[in-house]
């Protein structure tokens, strides 16, 4: 049985205490953050963390992010905290930024995929912070979806994947950003962007200078993943996804051509983007990159529910949040990309 705790209208501490009790007991709780919903367990309880991997069907070498509510918790989890980490934490925490640091001995290796590094962030969401505070434990939490599927931006999405399989879902409404956190590896110099996300790379570079972009961001395969989203296919709906990149007018013409082609083949076609199309299903993502990021996973899940055979997606410019949007679209498509 799964308990759904509704705090959409008002955050009541006694309700969050119920969920915190589940965390202390080694059980799983799905909760909202500013990015996507997380599937949380006590980060210091190895058996509880293993349940996350089992519930999601997640490969054991795909690390988890630990969520904290205070800098003091970071000092427990990380063996070393470089000056750059302190600068970034001071500027961007709470917020959608994950830092990869040398792990301390208290962090179970099941969380880190067997590596000597740990990924940590402080979420900018009142419910998430209150849950961590009341459970009195750091919380390990990947996105609250079956591995490989689009990430959840609402409690409804979580319930689609996990109702009856986990102990508790906290319903705090839709998430504000819609894509996962940005992950920066501070164990190398210059620092490395392992995953683009809700905090644009340009903002981080203003604080600590140049950051290298890991080749995995653009699809290069890796043997070892220091962060989630690097090694395996992610964010994918059931339908085939094709991303069309290029100038907006050319993208539109190409998508219209593809709609006609697939309809001739008897396929049901969906389109996600900012234009209107004569497709079977069209999901309008918005006009700004912030709106597109917020609605992307919702759109992919919507297309799954409508039963389309093919999803055609408009590419966006890779600036600001656009880098994260394109990273997610490319992975969702399995790198089926048409450039025009």
Curated annotation (Swiss-Prot):
GO molecular function: any one? ATP binding
Q: List residues of the YrdC-like domain.
A: 13-199
**GO terms classed as biological process:** regulation of translational fidelity; tRNA threonylcarbamoyladenosine modification
Where is this protein primarily located? Answer: cytoplasm
Does the keyword ATP-binding belong to this entry?
yes
Provide the residue positions that the database annotates as binding ATP. Answer: 58, 62, 117, 143, 151, 195, 235
Which top-level enzyme class is recorded in the Swiss-Prot or TrEMBL entry? transferase
Q: Would I find Translocase among this entry's keywords?
A: no
| SUPFAM superfamilies linked to this entry | YrdC/RibB (SSF55821)
Q: Which UniProt keywords apply?
A: ATP-binding, Cytoplasm, Nucleotide-binding, Nucleotidyltransferase, Transferase, tRNA processing
Where located?
Cytoplasm
Q: Where does L-threonine bind?
A: 35, 67, 121, 141, 181
Enzyme Commission number: 2.7.7.87
CC terms in the record's Gene Ontology section = cytoplasm
Q: What catalytic activity does the UniProt entry give for this protein? A: L-threonine + hydrogencarbonate + ATP = L-threonylcarbamoyladenylate + diphosphate + H2O
Q: Please explain the role this protein plays, according to its UniProt record.
A: Required for the formation of a threonylcarbamoyl group on adenosine at position 37 (t(6)A37) in tRNAs that read codons beginning with adenine. Likely catalyzes the conversion of L-threonine, HCO(3)(-)/CO(2) and ATP to give threonylcarbamoyl-AMP (TC-AMP) as the acyladenylate intermediate, with the release of diphosphate. Does not bind tRNA.
Homology family: Belongs to the SUA5 family.
- The name this protein goes by in its record: Threonylcarbamoyl-AMP synthase
């Amino acid at each position: 049985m799964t308990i759904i705790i509704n705090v959409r209208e008002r955050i009541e501490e006694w309700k969050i205490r119920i969920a915190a009790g589940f965390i202390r007991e080694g059980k799983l709780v799905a909760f909202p953050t500013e990015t996507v919903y997380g599937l949380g367990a006590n980060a210091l309880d190895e058996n509880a963390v293993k349940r996350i991997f089992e519930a999601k069907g997640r490969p054991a070498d795909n690390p988890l992010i630990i969520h904290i509510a205070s800098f003091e918790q970071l000092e427990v989890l990380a063996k070393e905290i470089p000056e750059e980490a302190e600068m970034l934490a001071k500027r961007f925490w709470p917020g959608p930024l994950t830092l990869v640091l040398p792990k301390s001995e208290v962090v179970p290796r099941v969380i880190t995929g067997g590596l000597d590094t740990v990924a940590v962030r402080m979420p900018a969401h009142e419910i998430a912070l209150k849950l961590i505070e009341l459970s009195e434990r750091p919380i390990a939490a990947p996105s609250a979806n079956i591995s490989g599927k689009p990430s959840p931006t609402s409690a409804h999405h979580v319930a689609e994947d996990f109702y009856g399989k986990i102990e508790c879902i906290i319903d705090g409404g839709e998430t504000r950003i819609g894509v996962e956190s940005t992950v920066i590896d501070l164990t190398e110099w210059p620092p490395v962007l392992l995953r683009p996300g809700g905090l644009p790379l340009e903002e981080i570079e203003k604080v600590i200078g140049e950051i290298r972009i890991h080749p995995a961001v653009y699809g290069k395969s890796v043997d070892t993943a220091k962060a989630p989203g690097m090694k395996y296919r992610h964010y994918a709906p059931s339908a085939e996804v094709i991303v069309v990149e290029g100038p907006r007018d050319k993208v539109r013409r190409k998508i219209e051509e593809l709609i006609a082609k697939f309809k001739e083949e008897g396929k049901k076609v969906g389109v996600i983007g900012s234009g209107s199309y004569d497709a079977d299903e069209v999901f309008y993502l918005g006009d700004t990159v912030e709106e597109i990021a917020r609605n992307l996973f919702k759109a992919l899940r919507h297309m799954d529910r409508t039963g389309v055979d093919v999803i055609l997606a408009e590419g966006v410019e890779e600036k600001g949040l656009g880098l994260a949007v394109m990273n997610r679209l490319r992975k969702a498509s399995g790198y089926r990309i048409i450039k025009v």
